[in-house]
Amino acid sequence: MWKKPAFIDLRLGLEVTLYISNR
């Protein structure tokens, strides 16, 4: 079982990357 915080961190990082790329 992987930790949820890690999943949230990865998801947040991905969203931030997409946001910056979309700018």
From Swiss-Prot:
InterPro entries: PQQ_synth_PqqA. There is a cross-link at residues 15-19 (Pyrroloquinoline quinone (Glu-Tyr)). It comes from the Bacteria. GO terms for biological process: pyrroloquinoline quinone biosynthetic process. Keywords: PQQ biosynthesis. Pathway: Cofactor biosynthesis; pyrroloquinoline quinone biosynthesis. Belongs to the PqqA family. NCBIfam families: PQQ_syn_pqqA. Required for coenzyme pyrroloquinoline quinone (PQQ) biosynthesis. PQQ is probably formed by cross-linking a specific glutamate to a specific tyrosine residue and excising these residues from the peptide. This is Coenzyme PQQ synthesis protein A. The gene is pqqA.
